[in-house]
């Protein structure tokens, strides 16, 4: 999905994923000329073609996310950064230096192991001659989807970075408190190699959640009354009150529900259905258990309907085009988008930072 966001200005020469199901969707849309389905740890520098301007790495978030096990870069999944960077070091040793490196992950990467994982990533980049900066970009600025993600953008020291791409100091909204804290933990030599990237703030209209919801969805069915009643029975008084207020509006209101484990008034952990009507979807997650799949609730006065979020709705919340092919199986589709990148977020980063950096490189060479 990074390729979708980068757009036609960038030509993809190599793509890698370990998941056959994701690869099938990629092939259906892009073809498979540059796709290699393989564990990144088994790739060799000779497998990567040419002299890349940009290398993009999105490594699994499970060991870094708030819902993960806290293993950080030592975990089996998020630990794929290490073989990825070993591969990049091999490419660099061959004199094929990527001019720009982008690493994407959950914001938990900033605090994992008290910030030591983030420091290790920055140090790895700086040791290979890169200047490094980072941004926290939330999909909610582009789509009705709360999905903050960390983007580490590194540029090789050979590139003269245009001044308009740099902030003199940290600034909102891209440089959040957690990012500033992580930066503050860096040793001085790494701070010396740091760049506070500048990005404009998007001001295009954001579609409402209701506008993305299908009345006749494909891949899911509306719940029975008993199933909907069960979801309502899991709501706390606070969330029941939200539901009641939506009913009093006497019009079609769309909300979403995630199930979460919360302590009750006696301190006992129980499952709760938490509903929101702010026209923002909760962050899509990979479908590990029923509670990780988001439920759509449509309220029309006394009538309340519910069902799982459909595959096409998940694709829309990630900004994928309508013609993007969906996996046949529900969980495969939900996994594809729950583990993916939000297309307009990548597009904004590409148009306002990555492409200008690439142009600066070409201008420098021409000069």
Per-region residue spans from a language model:
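SAM cofactor-binding core of SAM-dependent methyltransferases
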Residues: 1-42
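Active-site beta-strand/loop signature of hydrolases that rely on acidic residues for catalysis
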Residues: 17, 39, 99-105, 338
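Class I S-adenosyl-L-methionine
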Residues: 45-52, 62, 66-276
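C-terminal target-recognition/interaction regions appended to catalytic cores
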Residues: 212-367
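N-terminal Rossmann-like NAD(P) cofactor-binding module of classical short-chain dehydrogenase/reductase
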Residues: 54-56
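Active-site catalytic microenvironments for nucleophilic, acid-base chemistry
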Residues: 8, 90, 352-356
